[in-house]
Amino acid sequence: MARSVRVLVDMDGVLADFEAGLLRGFRRRFPEEPHVPLEQRRGFLAREQYRALRPDLADKVASVYEAPGFFLDLEPIPGALDAVREMNDLPDTQVFICTSPLLKYHHCVGEKYRWVEQHLGPQFVERIILTRDKTVVLGDLLIDDKDTVRGQEETPSWEHILFTCCHNRHLVLPPTRRRLLSWSDNWREILDSKRGAAQRE
């Protein structure tokens, strides 16, 4: 009997368009302040790039994503919802949404659950894994826009597939790392390669 391939899919920047929502919210709330266009975003933490632009902007940009309604109102990444549904329907495949809440979690946790229910349905709500440390979660693949995922486990069970986002598209990955350019890229090929490896175990 074939072993199932378990795919962990990050939420912000992979399923939900965090970066576009943040820029839109920042410009709406602070129209007179300088902002970082998406094509100039560098580094996973927007707060740090805004801090480098001007120190007081760090708290201002954080206030946007810490506000009620921010996570709930994020638009889906193009193709994400269809891809995850299709992936979940594949034989011998388990899909979980693996997402990290903010430290100021008061609004984001509930809104992440509501976002998933609204866009993917209640069956995916049961597949949410909420954790600050993704390295301790067992899986075969982690699709995530964060370029480096660290935690308690130095060698996590999953292979990290870097999902291309505005803040990481400039990074050159070593030959051993794989990247998914978008949901129209060939994610099925990545799953098939991992499935073949699982069957040889």
From Swiss-Prot:
Its cofactor is Mg(2+). It is an enzyme of class 3 (hydrolase). Dephosphorylates the 5' and 2'(3')-phosphates of deoxyribonucleotides, with a preference for dUMP and dTMP, intermediate activity towards dGMP, and low activity towards dCMP and dAMP. Belongs to the 5'(3')-deoxyribonucleotidase family. Homodimer. Substrate binds at residues 18, 44, 65, 99, 134. One of its GO terms (biological process) is amide catabolic process. The modification Phosphoserine is found at residue 182. Detected in skeletal muscle, heart and pancreas. It is found in: Cytoplasm. Keywords: Cytoplasm, Hydrolase, Magnesium, Metal-binding, Nucleotide metabolism, Nucleotide-binding, Phosphoprotein. GO terms for molecular function: 5'-nucleotidase activity; identical protein binding; IMP 5'-nucleotidase activity; metal ion binding; nucleotidase activity; pyrimidine nucleotide binding. Mg(2+) binds at residues 10, 12, 145. InterPro entries: 5'(3')-deoxyribonucleotidase, HAD-like_sf, HAD_sf. Its main location: cytoplasm. It comes from Homo sapiens. It comes from the Eukaryota. This is 5'(3')-deoxyribonucleotidase, cytosolic type. The active site is at residues 10, 12. Its EC number is 3.1.3.-.
